[in-house]
Protein backbone atom coordinates (compact mmCIF):
# COMPACT_ATOMS: atom_id res chain seq x y z
CA UNK A 1 0.00 0.00 0.00
CA UNK A 2 1.13 3.55 -0.70
CA UNK A 3 -0.20 6.88 0.64
CA UNK A 4 0.79 10.07 -1.17
CA UNK A 5 0.36 13.44 0.54
CA UNK A 6 0.95 15.65 -2.46
CA UNK A 7 1.80 18.90 -0.65
CA UNK A 8 2.21 18.14 3.08
CA UNK A 9 4.91 15.46 3.07
CA UNK A 10 8.56 16.40 3.30
CA UNK A 11 9.96 15.74 -0.17
CA UNK A 12 13.00 13.53 -0.68
CA UNK A 13 12.65 13.65 -4.47
CA UNK A 14 11.16 15.85 -7.15
CA UNK A 15 7.51 15.84 -8.20
CA UNK A 16 6.03 14.77 -11.52
CA UNK A 17 3.34 17.25 -12.58
CA UNK A 18 0.79 16.33 -15.25
CA UNK A 19 -0.14 19.61 -16.91
CA UNK A 20 -3.05 19.88 -19.36
CA UNK A 21 -2.73 22.22 -22.33
CA UNK A 22 -5.43 23.86 -24.49
CA UNK A 23 -7.19 21.68 -27.07
CA UNK A 24 -7.64 24.55 -29.48
CA UNK A 25 -8.18 27.81 -27.61
CA UNK A 26 -5.20 29.37 -25.81
CA UNK A 27 -7.56 31.15 -23.42
CA UNK A 28 -8.24 27.75 -21.81
CA UNK A 29 -4.70 27.64 -20.35
CA UNK A 30 -4.98 28.02 -16.56
CA UNK A 31 -2.96 30.32 -14.30
CA UNK A 32 -1.79 27.30 -12.34
CA UNK A 33 -0.63 25.49 -15.47
CA UNK A 34 1.46 28.49 -16.55
CA UNK A 35 2.96 28.88 -13.06
CA UNK A 36 3.81 25.18 -12.82
CA UNK A 37 5.50 25.11 -16.23
CA UNK A 38 7.62 28.10 -15.17
CA UNK A 39 8.59 26.56 -11.82
CA UNK A 40 9.59 23.00 -12.78
CA UNK A 41 13.11 22.10 -13.87
CA UNK A 42 12.13 20.40 -17.14
CA UNK A 43 9.07 19.97 -19.34
CA UNK A 44 8.57 16.56 -20.98
CA UNK A 45 6.86 17.34 -24.28
CA UNK A 46 5.25 15.09 -26.86
CA UNK A 47 6.32 17.48 -29.64
CA UNK A 48 8.87 20.11 -28.59
CA UNK A 49 8.08 22.30 -31.61
CA UNK A 50 4.38 22.38 -30.84
CA UNK A 51 4.92 22.90 -27.11
CA UNK A 52 7.59 25.50 -27.89
CA UNK A 53 4.95 27.73 -29.48
CA UNK A 54 2.78 27.40 -26.37
CA UNK A 55 5.71 28.23 -24.07
CA UNK A 56 6.65 31.24 -26.16
CA UNK A 57 3.09 32.57 -26.02
CA UNK A 58 3.08 32.44 -22.21
CA UNK A 59 6.71 33.58 -21.83
CA UNK A 60 7.87 30.28 -20.31
CA UNK A 61 11.62 29.64 -20.60
CA UNK A 62 11.81 26.16 -19.01
CA UNK A 63 13.92 23.66 -20.96
CA UNK A 64 12.06 20.89 -22.80
CA UNK A 65 12.82 17.16 -23.01
CA UNK A 66 11.39 15.23 -25.96
CA UNK A 67 9.12 12.47 -24.66
CA UNK A 68 6.78 10.59 -26.99
CA UNK A 69 5.59 7.07 -27.83
CA UNK A 70 8.66 6.30 -29.96
CA UNK A 71 11.28 7.13 -27.29
CA UNK A 72 9.35 6.58 -24.04
CA UNK A 73 10.94 3.20 -23.27
CA UNK A 74 14.48 4.62 -23.34
CA UNK A 75 13.62 7.99 -21.78
CA UNK A 76 11.68 6.89 -18.70
CA UNK A 77 14.71 5.60 -16.68
CA UNK A 78 16.53 8.91 -17.21
CA UNK A 79 13.45 10.91 -16.23
CA UNK A 80 13.01 8.85 -13.06
CA UNK A 81 16.69 9.48 -12.20
CA UNK A 82 16.09 13.22 -12.56
CA UNK A 83 13.08 13.01 -10.23
CA UNK A 84 14.98 10.93 -7.66
CA UNK A 85 17.78 13.52 -7.71
CA UNK A 86 15.29 16.19 -6.64
CA UNK A 87 14.38 17.74 -9.99
CA UNK A 88 10.71 18.36 -10.72
CA UNK A 89 9.23 17.59 -14.13
CA UNK A 90 6.06 18.59 -15.93
CA UNK A 91 4.64 16.30 -18.58
CA UNK A 92 2.46 17.77 -21.33
CA UNK A 93 0.86 16.36 -24.45
CA UNK A 94 0.27 18.26 -27.69
CA UNK A 95 -3.24 19.11 -26.52
CA UNK A 96 -5.43 18.24 -23.57
CA UNK A 97 -4.76 16.04 -20.58
CA UNK A 98 -1.50 14.04 -20.35
CA UNK A 99 -1.75 10.23 -20.15
CA UNK A 100 -4.87 10.21 -22.37
CA UNK A 101 -3.85 8.57 -25.67
CA UNK A 102 -0.16 9.37 -25.08
CA UNK A 103 2.79 7.64 -23.27
CA UNK A 104 2.34 9.59 -20.03
CA UNK A 105 0.74 6.64 -18.23
CA UNK A 106 3.98 4.63 -18.37
CA UNK A 107 5.91 7.53 -16.84
CA UNK A 108 3.29 7.93 -14.10
CA UNK A 109 3.46 4.22 -13.27
CA UNK A 110 7.27 4.31 -13.12
CA UNK A 111 7.18 7.35 -10.82
CA UNK A 112 4.68 5.71 -8.47
CA UNK A 113 6.78 2.54 -8.39
CA UNK A 114 9.72 4.73 -7.28
CA UNK A 115 7.69 6.49 -4.53
CA UNK A 116 7.75 9.78 -6.43
CA UNK A 117 4.78 12.12 -5.97
CA UNK A 118 2.56 12.54 -9.04
CA UNK A 119 0.35 15.64 -9.12
CA UNK A 120 -2.29 16.14 -11.83
CA UNK A 121 -3.56 19.62 -12.63
CA UNK A 122 -7.18 19.99 -13.78
CA UNK A 123 -7.81 21.40 -17.23
CA UNK A 124 -8.84 20.81 -20.81
CA UNK A 125 -9.95 17.32 -21.86
CA UNK A 126 -11.61 16.82 -25.23
CA UNK A 127 -13.68 13.80 -24.23
CA UNK A 128 -15.35 15.27 -21.15
CA UNK A 129 -15.77 18.69 -22.78
CA UNK A 130 -17.61 17.18 -25.75
CA UNK A 131 -19.61 14.72 -23.63
CA UNK A 132 -21.26 17.26 -21.36
CA UNK A 133 -22.56 19.27 -24.35
CA UNK A 134 -23.49 16.24 -26.46
CA UNK A 135 -26.95 15.68 -25.03
CA UNK A 136 -26.20 11.98 -24.50
CA UNK A 137 -26.10 10.48 -21.00
CA UNK A 138 -22.91 11.75 -19.31
CA UNK A 139 -22.75 8.83 -16.92
CA UNK A 140 -21.93 6.10 -17.01
CA UNK A 141 -19.52 6.60 -19.89
CA UNK A 142 -16.40 4.92 -21.22
CA UNK A 143 -13.58 6.44 -23.30
CA UNK A 144 -11.76 4.15 -25.75
CA UNK A 145 -9.39 6.56 -27.48
CA UNK A 146 -8.52 5.71 -31.08
CA UNK A 147 -10.32 2.86 -32.84
CA UNK A 148 -8.66 0.00 -34.76
CA UNK A 149 -8.00 1.09 -38.34
CA UNK A 150 -8.64 -2.17 -40.18
CA UNK A 151 -12.30 -2.86 -41.00
CA UNK A 152 -12.25 -6.44 -39.70
CA UNK A 153 -10.66 -5.48 -36.38
CA UNK A 154 -13.00 -2.52 -36.03
CA UNK A 155 -16.11 -4.63 -36.63
CA UNK A 156 -14.88 -7.21 -34.12
CA UNK A 157 -14.37 -4.37 -31.62
CA UNK A 158 -17.91 -3.08 -32.17
CA UNK A 159 -19.41 -6.58 -31.94
CA UNK A 160 -17.77 -6.94 -28.54
CA UNK A 161 -19.02 -3.56 -27.30
CA UNK A 162 -22.45 -3.20 -28.94
CA UNK A 163 -24.37 -4.39 -25.87
CA UNK A 164 -22.64 -2.05 -23.39
CA UNK A 165 -25.10 0.37 -21.73
CA UNK A 166 -22.49 3.09 -21.19
CA UNK A 167 -22.15 6.12 -23.47
CA UNK A 168 -19.03 5.46 -25.55
CA UNK A 169 -16.43 7.96 -26.78
CA UNK A 170 -13.85 7.56 -29.53
CA UNK A 171 -11.24 9.62 -31.36
CA UNK A 172 -11.33 9.15 -35.12
CA UNK A 173 -9.74 10.63 -38.23
CA UNK A 174 -12.03 12.71 -40.47
CA UNK A 175 -10.76 10.59 -43.37
CA UNK A 176 -12.05 7.36 -41.79
CA UNK A 177 -15.20 8.54 -40.06
CA UNK A 178 -17.66 7.45 -42.78
CA UNK A 179 -16.24 3.92 -42.89
CA UNK A 180 -16.26 3.81 -39.10
CA UNK A 181 -19.91 4.89 -38.89
CA UNK A 182 -20.85 2.33 -41.55
CA UNK A 183 -19.15 -0.43 -39.54
CA UNK A 184 -20.79 0.84 -36.37
CA UNK A 185 -24.23 0.88 -37.99
CA UNK A 186 -23.86 -2.77 -38.92
CA UNK A 187 -23.03 -3.76 -35.33
CA UNK A 188 -24.87 -1.21 -33.18
CA UNK A 189 -27.95 -0.54 -35.27
CA UNK A 190 -29.10 3.00 -35.96
CA UNK A 191 -28.58 4.43 -32.50
CA UNK A 192 -27.98 8.07 -31.59
CA UNK A 193 -24.50 9.54 -32.00
CA UNK A 194 -22.86 12.95 -31.73
CA UNK A 195 -19.95 13.82 -33.99
CA UNK A 196 -17.91 16.74 -32.66
CA UNK A 197 -15.28 18.55 -34.68
CA UNK A 198 -12.85 21.43 -34.06
CA UNK A 199 -13.67 21.51 -30.35
CA UNK A 200 -13.07 24.95 -28.72
CA UNK A 201 -11.95 26.38 -32.09
CA UNK A 202 -13.67 28.89 -34.38
CA UNK A 203 -15.41 26.19 -36.44
CA UNK A 204 -16.54 24.03 -33.50
CA UNK A 205 -19.49 21.90 -34.57
CA UNK A 206 -21.78 19.27 -33.02
CA UNK A 207 -23.58 16.92 -35.43
CA UNK A 208 -26.36 15.18 -33.49
CA UNK A 209 -28.58 12.43 -34.92
CA UNK A 210 -28.83 8.75 -35.75
CA UNK A 211 -25.89 7.02 -37.41
CA UNK A 212 -27.74 6.90 -40.74
CA UNK A 213 -28.59 10.61 -40.50
CA UNK A 214 -24.97 11.54 -39.84
CA UNK A 215 -23.82 9.35 -42.74
CA UNK A 216 -26.27 11.06 -45.09
CA UNK A 217 -25.13 14.47 -43.88
CA UNK A 218 -21.47 13.59 -44.44
CA UNK A 219 -22.22 12.60 -48.04
CA UNK A 220 -23.20 16.21 -48.69
CA UNK A 221 -20.87 17.88 -46.18
CA UNK A 222 -17.37 16.34 -46.02
CA UNK A 223 -15.84 16.38 -42.56
CA UNK A 224 -12.79 18.53 -41.85
CA UNK A 225 -10.71 18.95 -38.71
CA UNK A 226 -10.07 16.87 -35.60
CA UNK A 227 -13.13 14.97 -34.48
CA UNK A 228 -14.55 12.95 -31.61
CA UNK A 229 -17.41 10.47 -31.82
CA UNK A 230 -19.85 9.94 -28.94
CA UNK A 231 -22.30 7.03 -29.12
CA UNK A 232 -25.37 6.31 -27.02
CA UNK A 233 -25.17 3.14 -24.95
CA UNK A 234 -27.32 0.11 -25.70
CA UNK A 235 -30.84 0.16 -24.28
CA UNK A 236 -32.27 -2.92 -22.58
CA UNK A 237 -34.46 -4.89 -25.01
CA UNK A 238 -34.13 -2.06 -27.52
CA UNK A 239 -35.08 -2.47 -31.14
CA UNK A 240 -33.90 -0.43 -34.09
CA UNK A 241 -36.61 1.99 -35.15
CA UNK A 242 -37.20 1.81 -38.89
CA UNK A 243 -38.67 4.95 -40.39
CA UNK A 244 -39.56 6.04 -43.90
CA UNK A 245 -36.51 8.30 -43.86
CA UNK A 246 -34.11 5.34 -43.73
CA UNK A 247 -33.00 4.22 -47.19
CA UNK A 248 -31.93 0.61 -46.63
CA UNK A 249 -30.74 0.17 -50.21
CA UNK A 250 -28.39 3.14 -49.82
CA UNK A 251 -27.06 1.64 -46.59
CA UNK A 252 -26.40 -1.64 -48.40
CA UNK A 253 -24.56 0.27 -51.11
CA UNK A 254 -22.42 2.02 -48.49
CA UNK A 255 -21.52 -1.35 -46.98
CA UNK A 256 -20.44 -2.55 -50.43
CA UNK A 257 -18.40 0.62 -50.99
CA UNK A 258 -16.68 -0.09 -47.67
CA UNK A 259 -15.57 -3.48 -49.02
CA UNK A 260 -18.38 -5.90 -48.17
CA UNK A 261 -19.76 -8.34 -50.72
CA UNK A 262 -23.40 -7.68 -51.74
CA UNK A 263 -24.91 -10.65 -49.90
CA UNK A 264 -22.94 -9.86 -46.74
CA UNK A 265 -23.95 -6.19 -46.95
CA UNK A 266 -27.62 -7.16 -47.25
CA UNK A 267 -27.30 -9.52 -44.29
CA UNK A 268 -25.61 -6.83 -42.18
CA UNK A 269 -28.23 -4.15 -42.83
CA UNK A 270 -31.13 -6.60 -42.46
CA UNK A 271 -29.80 -7.61 -39.05
CA UNK A 272 -29.19 -4.01 -37.97
CA UNK A 273 -32.73 -2.93 -38.90
CA UNK A 274 -34.44 -6.23 -38.08
CA UNK A 275 -36.00 -6.60 -41.52
CA UNK A 276 -36.46 -9.72 -43.62
CA UNK A 277 -33.21 -10.43 -45.45
CA UNK A 278 -34.93 -11.91 -48.51
CA UNK A 279 -37.20 -8.89 -48.84
CA UNK A 280 -34.21 -6.55 -48.64
CA UNK A 281 -32.40 -8.72 -51.20
CA UNK A 282 -35.33 -8.35 -53.61
CA UNK A 283 -35.54 -4.63 -52.91
CA UNK A 284 -31.82 -4.16 -53.53
CA UNK A 285 -31.94 -6.09 -56.81
CA UNK A 286 -35.25 -4.42 -57.73
CA UNK A 287 -36.97 -7.77 -58.20
Swiss-Prot record:
Keyword rRNA processing: yes
GO cellular component, as recorded: cytoplasm
CDD domains the record matches: RsmI
Keyword Ligase: no
Reaction it catalyzes: cytidine(1402) in 16S rRNA + S-adenosyl-L-methionine = 2'-O-methylcytidine(1402) in 16S rRNA + S-adenosyl-L-homocysteine + H(+)
One GO molecular-function entry: rRNA (cytosine-2'-O-)-methyltransferase activity
Cellular compartment(s): Cytoplasm
Broad class of enzyme this protein falls into: transferase
Keyword annotations from UniProtKB, A to Z: Cytoplasm, Methyltransferase, rRNA processing, S-adenosyl-L-methionine, Transferase
Top-level division of the source organism's lineage: Bacteria
Role summary: Catalyzes the 2'-O-methylation of the ribose of cytidine 1402 (C1402) in 16S rRNA.
PANTHER family listed in its UniProt record: RIBOSOMAL RNA SMALL SUBUNIT METHYLTRANSFERASE I
Protein name, entry field: Ribosomal RNA small subunit methyltransferase I
Lineage: Bacteria, Bacillati, Bacillota, Bacilli, Lactobacillales
